[in-house]
Structure formats: structure tokens, C-alpha cells
Amino acid sequence: MLNLTKLSPSITDMIRFDHSHVMVTFHQYTTSSKPSVKKALAETICTALEIHATLEEEIFYPVVRQINGSEPVIQKSAPEHNEMRRVIAELRATGPTELRHDELVMELMRDVIHHVADEETVLLPEAERLLGKDRLSELGVQMTKRRLELVKPKAGKIAANTAIGFSGSTAAMVLGVASALMAVKWVSKKAAA
């Protein structure tokens, strides 16, 4: 029988990948881009952040709170996610030709950079130290399954935004990772059969 835990990246590696994906997308966004590209990139950023925040809130943060709920980074995670959702709502209410749209993308980027720095320098290393490789892999499997549930209803929109917003090499990288995630799902179905 196939052990998915050994195939799945650890939850901390998945979180780092999410951070990298969003940062790459932010770097694709320029104020001089065509409105259709700006809209597609902004929507890609918003969707990725919403999915990422949901995964952290449902799977990662509860486990971290159990092992060290007093960690300041974990205590400020919920307010940071709430602020992110507020900015996303405001961003979606603006059009890509409005100056406010560009300002909100930059505000969101600053907030995300701060959040990523906290997680990657404090929270993720601590989780790796305290949880151990097997538990991190188990959580990675949970995160992969939940991610697929969250992505499935948005797959068409995600693909369209990727095609519009990304350069060829970036789109290929993103689609390659998406293909890998789908392969994990396929393998899990085969293993269960």
C-alpha cells in the first residue's frame, strides 16, 4: 500500500511554497501593465492568499497553538489575516485602471512581506523543531487534501487568470506545481482502490 505521507511535502514546505508563489505574483504586477493583466494578477494574489489563510487557520495554526500558543507570531496571525481580507475586499471593489487599485496591491504586498518574514524566521522553524518530520508530513497530506477542495470550484478562474497574467515561464512553473498536486490526488485515489 502506498504511503502518501512519504510523498507529500511537509506542511512547512507547502507554506513556504505558497509564500514564494504569492511573492512571484506580486513581482509580476506593475502599474504600467495592461488593465487585464493587472486584474488577473490581483485576482491571482487574492485567491492564493485566501486559500493560504484558510489552510493555515484550519490546519497549521491549531497545531502550533497546542504546542506553543504564547508565541507572539501566532497570536497576531488572526488579526493579520483579517486585515488581509479587508484589503482584498477593497481591492476587488476597485478597477485595474484606478490609482487606488495599484495602491491596494502595494499595501497588500507590504503586509504579506511582513507576515511571511515572521512566519519563515520564527514560526516555521519552531514548528519543524517541535513537531518532527512525520507529523509535518501528515499535516502536509491534510493540507494537500484541503487545498484541492478549496481550489476545485475556482480552477477555471485560476487557470484563466494564470493565462492572462503570467509570463510564459512563470505560468509553466505554476501549472507544473498544480499538476504535481493533482498527481498526488490521483495517486491517493489509486492507493485507496
What are these regions, as identified by a protein language model?
Residues M1-A193:
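Small-residue-biased structural context
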